[in-house]
Amino acid sequence: MSSQQIVFLIVNAIGGIAVLGSYAIGLGMFPEYREALWGEVRGTLRTGITISMLFAALGYLSFCYVALFQNGLSDFNKVNWFNQYTVSVLIAIFLISATFWMPTAIAYLNFSNTYWLVVCILSLWVTAISLVAILGITITADLESIGSISHYVAIIGIGLITFHCLVFDAIIWAIMFTK
């Protein structure tokens, strides 16, 4: 296993635990806010967002599979913004910012302080922008190490989570939460 793959795995393991942990702790310690965390998102829109969450998670896992097991990291990291760890750095930014959403949303609901709302929405935008960067890198990657099918799987996978985080979280949820 290459150093790129090891760093990628560590970032995803620690970051994934942090994101899921923030959700578990937030919902476990503040069950009274479960409904309020949806804001004004109701009915069909809520169902659609929930279904999109599942596709986004599967898409991200598909991207990770290509990155780790189809030599995608070697092609994706040729962008060289952060040496050979560009994708891992962007994923760290994505996961760190995603970890902030639940606690800042709960802090806003608990204290009604606009500061928490700003940090909450900013965390959603940082999450979305980092995913847009990863999507751009994935789309423009050379196909030296991976085949076209793996490349398209990675694009569709990261595209699904990017769409969800940008459209449903950073735009729609932010508008509906602050109504």
Give the predicted meaning of each segment.
Residues 72-131:
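Membrane-proximal helix-loop-helix units in multi-pass membrane proteins
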Residues 25-26, 58-73, 132-138:
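Membrane-water interface of transmembrane alpha-helices
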Residues 1-4, 29-45, 105-118, 143-146, ...:
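Membrane-interface interhelical loops and short amphipathic "cap" helices
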Residues 42-61:
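Interfacial helix-start motif at the membrane-water boundary
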Residues 15-31, 167-169:
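Alpha-helical transmembrane segments of multi-pass membrane proteins
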Residues 1-15, 47, 84-85, 145-159:
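Alpha-helical transmembrane segments and their helix-start/interface "positive-inside/aromatic belt" motifs
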Residues 129-179:
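Terminal transmembrane helical module of multi-pass membrane proteins
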